[in-house]
Amino acid sequence: MSRVCELTGKAVLTGNNVSHANNKTKRRFLPNLCQVTLISDALNQRYRLRVSAAALRSVEHRGGLDAFLLKASENELSMRARLLRRQIVKKTAEAAVAA
């Protein structure tokens, strides 16, 4: 399992620890990933995703998983999140036609 957020694409970065004497040693900056279960209102299902804490805040800020995925670009989403986004778009389009 890779260390990449499924919603934002945030991944591991590399850099240096720099001491007071300016000695540099390589290090990795790991994203703060959490396993969370998010509920899709349009599909009435629960989905377990591995997302960063920042992405979780963004999901709540935008008003839920559906709103976040509809506003997000497909480039930064994982393949699983892209499929979920397409299902939500299809379901909301069907609901709009029926109404």
Curated annotation (Swiss-Prot):
GO terms for cellular component: cytosolic large ribosomal subunit. This is Large ribosomal subunit protein bL28. It comes from the Bacteria. Belongs to the bacterial ribosomal protein bL28 family. GO terms for biological process: translation. The keyword Repeat does not apply. The gene is rpmB. One of its GO terms (molecular function) is structural constituent of ribosome. Keywords: Ribonucleoprotein, Ribosomal protein. InterPro entries: Ribosomal_bL28, Ribosomal_bL28/bL31-like_sf, Ribosomal_bL28_bact-type, Ribosomal_bL28_sf. Pfam families: Ribosomal_L28.
